């Protein structure tokens, strides 16, 4: 029995970076483990939304109270970053980013993905994969370009020569560094957190990993908040037309 427990602990603490389980779709290879965990997170969010909105009451119950609190938090976050006049249409986008990243990060800390065996690689939080974080960052880039072009038309590109045309290369470079910083910050923090916990579980499996897991949950929440806040700030900058 003790041997079985030790085997399970070492399985949970095994560290594999760069190992992937692929699905072949036509001539393309996709990272199956990222899709599996992403679908799980999306399904969980949809399930919670359906349960919370199935029977709305004038005097809300505990679940409805919690959902309303989350929505108010997202609304206030979006309004603070984008502004009173424009924020309403961007609540769904910023809210979806925040909730997906938050639940993805927490799933990596709370769910023992490594127990589920794959032919190759291992399951982990969706945000533990650089492809996911880059995709989220690119979506944010598309969103703030769309926001600026939709409001200002082609005159939006005039921001690149403000306050002087000399800054044109730097202003263009800034639009490339924004998604890079968003994606690598999120990916690096989540990967580092899971690696630290995995190493500590393998060294001291019973005591030290517990406070580290709580710290990881806190850090995961902060990273989701930072990503959503910066996404809202970038959209707000595009709508205002200045940096």
UniProtKB/Swiss-Prot annotation:
**Which family, according to the similarity comment?**
Belongs to the ATPase A chain family.
Q: Assembly and partners?
A: F-type ATPases have 2 components, CF(1) - the catalytic core - and CF(0) - the membrane proton channel. CF(1) has five subunits: alpha(3), beta(3), gamma(1), delta(1), epsilon(1). CF(0) has four main subunits: a, b, b' and c.
User: What protein name is recorded for this chain?
Assistant: ATP synthase subunit a, chloroplastic
Record carries keyword ATP-binding = no
Q: Which residue spans traverse the membrane?
A: 32-52, 91-111, 130-150, 195-215, 216-236
Print the keywords alphabetically.
ATP synthesis, CF(0), Chloroplast, Hydrogen ion transport, Ion transport, Membrane, Plastid, Thylakoid, Transmembrane, Transmembrane helix, Transport
Domain of life assignment: Eukaryota
What InterPro entries would the database entry show? ATP_syn_F0_a_bact/chloroplast (IPR045082), ATP_synth_F0_asu (IPR000568), ATP_synth_F0_asu_AS (IPR023011), F0_ATP_A_sf (IPR035908)
Say if the entry is tagged with keyword Transmembrane helix. Answer: yes
| Listed GO MF terms | proton-transporting ATP synthase activity, rotational mechanism
Predominant cellular place of this UniProt entry's protein:
plastid
**GO CC field:** chloroplast thylakoid membrane; plasma membrane; proton-transporting ATP synthase complex
Q: What is the species of this protein?
A: Chaetosphaeridium globosum
Which Pfam family, any one, appears in the UniProt record? ATP-synt_A
